[in-house]
Amino acid sequence: SSTQNLSTSPILRRQNRIRTIYSSLAIEQNTLSLEQVTAVLSGKRVLAPPKDIAEVKNAYEIYDHLAELNPYSMDDLLLAHRTMMQGLVREAGEFRSGPVGVVDNKGNVLHFGTLPQYVPSLMEELIQWTESSSLPILIKSCVFHYEFEVIHPFSDGNGRIGRLWHTLLLSKWNPVFAWLPVESIIQDHQAEYYAAINQSNAQGEGTVFIEFMLGIIKEALTEAINEQPVAQSKEEVRWMKIAAFLRTNYIIQNVDVQNLLNVSPATASRVLHTLTKEGKLAKVRNGRYWAYKLA
């Protein structure tokens, strides 16, 4: 299926990861373009405010370690904030010590976050509820995202951590969600994102926001399904089959390649010669015959 292509294609995954980081930061007024974000993450020099560059590097670091995070660990949540906000805010990796107003992307105050003295216990409660509730994870993750934004536990970085944690919760249910560009779809519907938070606040419960986020997730899935996988050349497919064979066998011989790829002895010989020249295989003596192993 196309979502499997997303899980297995490193090119698609990298593209979506970069889009995710670009979008999550653009929502927070980061000025870098998608091309500049790509350049920063490729180690190139980019002329831009140092703060914006640091935000990109920090975000990439935490998204890169997504698989290692436990969504039900307070320590991991604080670690994620510390990584995301290191060098950017004084209280990186700590719950805020002062009051905070929750603002939209235009600077309008939507509501005021929970009083700081109640933040740790409310966050503990929210994490425990998310872990123990029997609601489907699709719903629970949206509830967590909404309640997290209401509490607004940090002095800064709440939006990007809330979206990161939503992705993390979903990715533990199905790994494909680690690579879905949910943040990009939110960026496309930014005004509605804040309106949904606003409406839910006015109603005193998160139904509007939950329905909005379910729509966003559906749109991200639809986009992934419609996304054409990057076509692989015949050579790449052959190399993948040989590499897979060599993960369970120490060496491969001409006859193995014939059977594996359904080719003639001459073609098998040519394939092995090319892969050796490319530095992927190394030629070794195997009794009276030549064989090949991973270089």
Located regions from the model:
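FIC/Doc superfamily catalytic core
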Residues: 1-295
